[in-house]
Amino acid sequence: MRLLTCDCTFMGQKHSGSVSVEKKNQENDGPPTYEIVFGWSQSFENLMKHRAGQKYFAEFLKGEYSDENILFWQACEELKREKNAEKIEEKARIIYEDFISILSPKEVSLDSRVREIVNTNMGRPSASTFDEAQNQIYTLMQRDSYPRFLASNIYKTVMGTFGIKEEAV
């Protein structure tokens, strides 16, 4: 059994979480239950630990022209699960080209301090090369996009499949 972990900072406080692969797969099989979907409104962490939550959130972000944020976050999670050193280096370079490079159409918005850390880390890519950048993007999505997602038609429609009206959400 492997653990998937995310260590992020939000409003100056450390956020840590881990989910076993077996449990995660059980939670993600089939359509989400009411409890799972309602849980998405209780915390961003709940939303992000479910494949369906990420799917609906990505759909929302695509409509806001900011889906590069979740795509980057997901790519970083995949990189952290990789154990083969050669594949880690290859995946890190792809992530850099796709999301960090100023030439990329999917460039994520990072402050100069974090961008410099990533550039330094790319000298010797590892599974943690993008940790600072991933934390910054996670926080950005949590503060900025997540509240709008909860008020979006996408989330209201998903809740509506359980007979829940807008007022209750």
Swiss-Prot record:
UniProt entry tagged with the keyword Transcription regulation: no
BP-aspect Gene Ontology terms: negative regulation of signal transduction
Phenotype when the gene is knocked out: RNAi-mediated knockdown in ASH sensory neurons results in hypersensitivity to dilute quinine.
A single GO molecular function term of this UniProt record: GTPase activator activity
Highest taxon above the source species: Eukaryota
Alphabetized UniProt keyword annotations: Phosphoprotein, Signal transduction inhibitor
SUPFAM superfamilies xref list: Regulator of G-protein signaling, RGS
Pfam families, A to Z: RGS (PF00615)
Entry keyword Lipid biosynthesis: no
Modification after translation, per record: May be phosphorylated and activated by egl-4.
Tissue expression notes: Expressed in a subset of neurons including ventral cord and head- and tail-ganglia neurons. Also expressed in non-neuronal cells including pharyngeal and uterine muscles.
Residue stretches making up the RGS domain: 39-158
Described function: Weakly inhibits G protein signaling in nervous system, interacting preferentially with the G(O) subfamily member goa-1. In vitro, it acts as a GTPase activator of goa-1. Rgs-1 and rgs-2 redundantly adjust signaling when worms are fed to allow rapid induction of egg-laying behavior. Modulates chemotaxis responses by regulating negatively the sensitivity to quinine in ASH sensory neurons.
Official protein name in the record: Regulator of G-protein signaling rgs-2
Provenance organism: Caenorhabditis elegans
